[in-house]
């Protein structure tokens, strides 16, 4: 029997189907763990720019689902701003700034706008950081969920941008707007959309994800904080972990009932990074040298610190979520150091300034940050520093080894005398999607 070449190719394709590409439908990826599981990519050669599309300002990263890219921005109105009471420190000066927030849907292949939805959103937060939305859109079963910087929560149809339901955390729940706006990414759990909201008895609220009907509310705190809630299994029990301005709490995600809590107050309520969990240890970190590991008891009813919190232990990263692997935390932290820490002891195994500086060694500044994504197939880690560089590195408890570095996007936001970009990229379909306050870019990372 003679088999033609074309028939052989067809049969091979049937027997060995292509590995499906992965979407990135929410903050930190499909499983909200900062891990990219897609193979067939090259991480040690400069990526090829496929397209770029103009955007307004914003910290929120893009999300990718079913051939579309979703991102949010703000276009301010410079006329008509009203001065609010000022403080001494520019990091706390607030004004009322007119402007619109916008949710944008792009074609993944071309970057062309498919639809957009904008709404009035005057800002009342600190002017220096009143750039745009903080939260990456979440796409789940045909619905896009977007949370703006002033507490506007919208659910829209993913295909055409039709508003299905909406909430306003200020008018609906009495949220007193925090200095740096609302920044905790919503998450989906079963039929619920769970959000950090604010207001009396409503630090965290669960909505019916299809209708917006409130299903439960829980906790009170002076401020809700900025950290994204997470759902993890501890001692065999799935738990919702929330860090507000007063404490870390473990809740039943179905009902909002609290199992345990630990008092640990982040400076200025800056609980930005999402909690990470290893076995029965819950890791949190924040501004001003604050980091800790909380040990949850076997009955899931009480806690104790695994080690005494100290500025000399932990990482204390500010704008990013740490990456946790095999009991070791990797993150940018205080004083421009990227660190590896043993979560069980708080001991710093090593630290390096290289990932947080530019390729030429310059660029030291305040609140240096980096977003870390582990690439599971290669065992390598991608580090996106706030200079607009993408670094490929090998991270282990033994040290930091840099493999490649590429400049992918211009830093456009000025803070403390330097330009930076604080936006988590998306990694999907062998591509990286990144944005600043001027544009969104798409690069090809596929292996040739």
Residue ranges and their predicted role:
Residues 19-448:
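Noncatalytic, solvent-exposed loop/strand surfaces
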Residues 1-4:
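N-terminal secretory signal peptides that target proteins for export/translocation
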């Amino acid at each position: 029997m003679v088999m033609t070449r074309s028939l052989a190719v067809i049969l091979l394709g049937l027997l060995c189907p292509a590995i499906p590409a992965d979407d990135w439908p929410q903050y930190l990826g499909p499983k909200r763990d900062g891990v990219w599981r897609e193979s067939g990519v090259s991480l040690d050669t400069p990526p090829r720019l496929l397209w770029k599309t103009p955007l307004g300002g914003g910290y929120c990263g893009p999300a990718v689902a079913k051939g579309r890219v979703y991102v949010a921005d703000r276009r301010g109105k410079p006329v008509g701003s009203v001065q609010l009471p000022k403080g001494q420190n520019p990091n706390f000066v607030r004004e009322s700034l007119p402007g619109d927030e916008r949710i944008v849907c792009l074609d993944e292949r071309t970057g062309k706008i498919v639809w957009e939805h904008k709404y009035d959103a005057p800002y009342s937060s600190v002017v220096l950081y009143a750039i745009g939305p903080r939260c990456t859109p979440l796409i789940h079963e045909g619905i896009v969920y977007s949370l703006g910087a002033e507490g506007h929560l919208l659910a829209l149809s993913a295909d055409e941008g039709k508003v299905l339901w909406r909430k306003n955390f200020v008018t609906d729940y009495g949220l007193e707007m925090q200095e740096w706006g609302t920044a905790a990414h919503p998450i989906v759990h079963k039929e619920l959309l769970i959000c950090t909201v604010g207001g009396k008895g409503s630090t965290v609220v669960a909505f019916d994800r299809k209708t917006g009907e409130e299903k439960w509310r829980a906790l009170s705190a002076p401020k809700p904080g900025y950290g994204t809630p997470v759902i993890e299994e501890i001692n065999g029990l799935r738990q919702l972990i929330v860090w507000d301005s007063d404490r870390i709490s473990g809740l039943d995600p179905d009902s909002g009932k609290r199992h345990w809590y630990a008092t640990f107050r982040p400076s200025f309520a800056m609980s930005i990074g999402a909690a990470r969990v290893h076995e029965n240890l819950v890791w949190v970190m924040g501004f001003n040298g604050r980091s800790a590991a909380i040990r949850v008891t076997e009955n899931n009813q009480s806690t104790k610190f695994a080690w005494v919190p100290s500025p000399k232990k932990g990482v204390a990263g500010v704008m990013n979520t740490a990456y946790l692997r095999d009991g070791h935390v990797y993150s940018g932290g205080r004083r421009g150091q990227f660190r590896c820490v043993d979560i069980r002891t708080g001991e710093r195994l090593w630290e390096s300034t290289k990932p947080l500086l530019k390729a030429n060694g310059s660029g030291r500044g305040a609140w240096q940050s980096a977003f870390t994504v582990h690439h599971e197939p290669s065992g390598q880690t991608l580090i996106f520093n706030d200079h607009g560089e993408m670094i490929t590195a090998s991270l282990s408890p033994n040290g930091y080894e840099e493999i490649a570095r590429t400049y992918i996007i211009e830093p456009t936001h000025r803070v403390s005398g330097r330009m930076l970009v604080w936006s988590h990229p998306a990694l999907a379909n062998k591509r990286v999607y990144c944005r600043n306050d001027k544009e969104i870019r798409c690069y090809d990372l596929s292996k040739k």
